[in-house]
Amino acid sequence: VNDGRKRKVWKSMSIPYTQNAREVLRLAEEAAKENGSGYVGTEHLLLGMIREQAGVASQVLKNNGITEEKLKDMISSLRLEEGKTAVMDRDGYTPRLRDILDGAMELAEEQYHVKELGTEFFLLATILERQNVALKLMEAAGANVPKIYFETLAAMGVNLQEHRQDLTGDPQQGQD
């Protein structure tokens, strides 16, 4: 399905994933199988981030009331619209999940210059991608997404003043 969006070319990893990040992807694949999905989507990545309990993403999500219990019912009720098919790569990842993984790699390499990509980059990229099932699930679960974004940055030791306009485009907004 071509939705008119420009697709990024899947980058080869130039920095390695942390053990926690690799575990998130494994748990996402496991969640997709448990759900009977023929693909691994952003909703499964979100479940993987929650199930992996040691990473920044898991801690921030749990601190903001995003739990596996809340998400499982919402995910199991998700159905593709009639006539639409999830397009996926050979590994079963949807294009939107690939976009998030690309975005995480870009953030880690180009903006934060880290040596390993951790779970926090999956969470930041999910929020910044904006149009994905995982983000809609967080919002439906009652999460304050900007708060999650800024708490993730704070957990990384980032100066929050430099990121006030990331989500709003307005440097005066973005924080309480």
PLM region descriptions:
Residues 1-176:
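Histone-fold recognition with a strong bias for associated Lys/Arg-rich disordered tails
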